[in-house]
UniProtKB/Swiss-Prot annotation:
Protein name from the UniProt record: Small G protein signaling modulator 3
Residue span(s) of domain Rab-GAP TBC: 115-306
InterPro entries: Rab-GAP-TBC_dom, Rab-GAP_TBC_sf, Rab_GAP_TBC_domain, Run_dom, Run_dom_sf, SGSM3_SH3, SH3-like_dom_sf, SH3_domain
Family the entry assigns: Belongs to the small G protein signaling modulator family.
Length: 755
């Protein structure tokens, strides 16, 4: 490359793939001025060398163990093997002449155990793992994956952004946002989260990907991860449940009983839970756990033999330190020794040698038997804790399914010649299945959020009711007014109790309102105590047909906002966009919000005058804001108008309006009824959607049943949280207007605390 710098052989960054060479740092190394010194020193892999261990590191680099200092005899043995098995014609053997997969043999395994020459690792890893075969036979290209995932504004994408600089902070390729590896890491992780929607993003994948990127191009790194996820590791290794890696921890514990009985006795005597340490080893495939030079030797074997290597290496590491562990005096010493064990290893060949010597007899058949047994135990335990999630648990046991992508004709060819009907119909059916699966996943994740944070929701049934009677009950339930007449409020800040007739509370406490006779001072009850408090210090809760939950309040629990606006709303928008008619080339905009506006208006215009008068009554006199007056149609119309009024002044996009409307529907517990209202507006639906769309087909009924599950949870989401905050509306402490009046009344009047 013109104007680029190349690392010195054996020097800093010399073991990295050329695209990862940090040019800004190499430029400093290549400066001719002998008086100029680089502030930080880096090793051949780009890791920062600390001053206290710099001498030891340089000694290691000068030894025979450095990967770039290849043994000529070792390289010749690999070349001879490849020539013998692949070169059947006269001429030089090149990588493009070698098949995508290498035939397994004792000779090949022996070569892998002896180590792969570092310069040959990128090509051999791709072939040993099967990643190259996946890359060449995939229906979707890496470019398409990046394009599709770049617009995937999900919770996973936000979490990836937070973790980019945490993944490998001591490596020059990943320690700042401008580092050469960070954009690559972002694209690969977002691509994996899009490619495997059932998995999403797991922090363990970030560790593995960052290490792969040091030696492979980003496209190859993605396909290596596909091989790991689909073939080399069991299902659900990186899923939200971590069932696969949890199972392997129990299998490891049983193997220790068999192979390391002295260590097993020690762990039992001191009641040490080994998985607290080793789960991270397995989840990251030892990336960021052991020294990078040892990791390369482990991965050589892992990509050839699969997950069995994780057990063999762990057993070998424990065997090396067994005597030291057994001689430990107490539990703390044992735990610390186990935690520090990987960082104390220096010889990769010794680790692999001990692993093969001790656990070389371990077979894949034995491993699978152990896994099936312990997986059954885990599922039985989790089923007892939450029988309602048995469906999601069983789903996680299935083989990991990659998202499919149907290649479409260009817009011009579609206009001129149309689409192949059979292919188009197949693509639409597959797309509909994916849309429902994505929505169901978003709903289940939201429900699990409530299960984890609010114990009252643990017994909530998440199974959609598809019966005909359920639709009749929807409207009956909507018309039933809650008999719970108590009013409650949430504390906006702390209020300290000074007198016996005052009610003290902390921010976010839930207070039962006893009296609101006075404008400034209310009487309430909390934890069996009654007293007065400033009305401005609390906010009335919206609990018409529900009981307030902190898990659904985005001012208290920020995660619920990410789940709804970052996961549920995109899934719903995809359904509303499916089959939406595109405008002509010179036509206007096309967005689900425009359809919602029109359908909502059409449903209320039949009796517009009476509806308008009721809306005015509700707004002016607060008459029946709990649904006794307003029907679902009227609530939808009112919500659309409210969103437009608040959002138009901020000039936000229609995507934001759509997400805000979904939040209102969740607050009102009528999201499923609103879908029915919209799909029942046939004139608007036929105008905006193709016949094969969800909203014009009977498929919308299934979507309604899925959404009904969310009506079982109490949401308190802000409609305007995505709007820019005005300066004059910045948060203020509610201690200004009216507080003087409240204090005067407190001293001049006696309060009837008992109401």
């Amino acid at each position: 490359m013109s104007g680029s710098y190349t690392p010195a052989p054996g020097g800093p960054f010399s073991a990295l793939t050329p695209s990862m060479w940090p040019q800004d740092i190499l430029a400093k190394y290549c400066q001719k001025d002998p008086g100029t010194e680089v502030e930080l020193q880096y090793d051949e892999f780009g890791f920062r060398i600390d001053s206290e261990d710099g001498v030891e590191t340089r000694k290691w680099l000068c030894g025979d163990g450095a990967p770039q200092r290849e043994d000529p005899q070792q390289r010749l043995r690999w070349q001879a093997h490849l020539e013998f098995t692949h070169n059947h014609t006269v001429g030089d053997l090149t990588w493009d002449k070698i098949t995508p997969t290498l035939a397994r043999s004792d000779r090949l395994r022996s070569l892998v155990l002896g180590g792969i020459p570092h310069s040959m690792r990128p090509q051999l890893w791709m072939r040993l793992s099967g990643a190259l075969q996946k890359k060449r036979t995939s229906d979707i290209s890496y470019r398409e994956i990046v394009k599709n995932s770049s617009n995937d504004d999900t919770t996973a994408a936000k979490q990836i952004e937070k973790d980019l600089l945490r993944t490998m902070p001591t490596n020059a390729c990943f320690n700042t946002l401008t580092s050469v590896g960070v954009p690559k890491l972002r694209r690969v992780l977002r691509g994996l989260a899009w490619l495997y929607p059932d998995i999403g993003y797991c922090q363990g994948t970030g560790m593995v990907v960052s290490c792969l990127l040091l030696f492979l191009e980003e496209e190859d790194a993605l396909w290596m991860m596909c091989a790991l996820i689909e073939d080399l590791l069991p299902p659900s290794y990186f899923s939200s449940t971590l069932l696969g890696v949890q199972t392997d921890q129990r299998v490891l514990r049983q193997l220790i009983v068999q192979y390391l009985p002295r260590l097993d006795k020690l762990l039992q005597e001191h009641d040490i839970e080994l998985s607290l340490i080793t789960l991270h080893w397995f989840l990251t495939a030892f990336a960021s756990v052991v020294d990078i030079r040892i990791l390369l030797r482990i991965w050589d074997l892992l990509f050839y033999e699969g997950s069995m290597v994780l057990f063999q290496v762990t057993l070998g590491m424990l065997k090396i330190k067994e005597d030291e562990l057994v001689s430990s005096e107490n539990s703390a010493s044992i735990f610390n020794t186990l935690s520090d064990l990987p960082s104390q290893l220096e010889d990769g060949a010794a680790v692999l040698g001990e692993a093969v010597r001790l656990a070389g007899s371990l077979s894949q058949e034995n491993l699978d038997t152990h896994r099936h047994k312990h997986l059954a135990y885990i599922l039985a335990e989790q089923a007892q804790l939450n029988s309602n999630n048995s469906h999601s648990l069983n789903t996680n046991l299935n083989k990991v399914v990659r998202r499919q992508n149907m290649r479409r004709k260009s817009t011009l060819s579609s206009l001129l010649w149309g689409e192949d009907e059979v292919e188009a119909l197949k693509a639409k059916n597959i797309k509909q299945t994916e849309l429902v699966a994505a929505l169901r996943e978003a709903i289940n994740r939201t429900a699990e959020h409530f299960h984890c944070l609010d114990p009252r929701n643990c017994s909530t049934d998440l199974t959609p009711d598809y019966s005909m009677e359920s639709h009749q009950r929807d409207h009956e339930n909507f018309l039933v007014v809650s008999r719970n007449r108590r009013r409650r409020a949430k504390a906006l800040l702390d209020f300290e109790r000074h007198d016996d007739d005052e009610l003290g509370f902390r921010k976010n406490d839930i207070i039962t309102i006893i009296s609101q006779k006075d404008e400034h001072c209310w009487v309430g009850e909390l934890n069996g105590l009654r007293g007065w408090f400033p009305a401005k210090f609390v906010e009335i809760l919206d609990e018409r047909s529900k009981e307030y939950s902190l898990a659904g309040d985005d001012t208290v629990t920020e995660a619920v906002n990410d789940l709804v606006r970052g996961s549920l709303c995109p899934a719903l928008k995809a359904i509303f966009q499916h089959g939406l008619k595109k405008p002509s080339i010179l036509g206007g905009p096309c967005h689900p919000w425009l359809f919602i506006e029109e359908a909502a208006s059409k449903e209320v215009e039949r009796d517009f005058n009476s509806v308008y008068s009721r809306l005015v009554l509700c707004k002016t006199y607060r008459l029946d804001e709990d649904g006794k007056v307003l029907t679902p149609e009227e609530l939808l119309y009112r919500a659309v108008q409210s969103v437009n009024m608040s959002h138009d002044t901020a000039h936000v996009q229609m995507d934001v309006k759509f997400r805000s409307l979904i939040c209102v529907g969740l607050n009102e517990q009528v999201l499923h009824l609103w879908l029915e209202v919209l799909c029942s507006s046939m004139s608007a639906v036929e105008k905006w959607y193709h016949p094969w769309s969800f909203l014009r087909s009977p498929g919308w009924v299934q979507i309604k049943c899925e959404l009904r599950v969310l009506s079982k949870f109490a949401f308190s989401l802000s409609q305007d949280c995505e709007l820019p905050t005005k300066k004059e509306e910045k948060e203020q402490r509610p201690l200004k207007e009216g507080v003087q009046d409240m204090l005067v009344k407190h001293h001049l009047f006696s309060w009837d605390i008992d109401g």
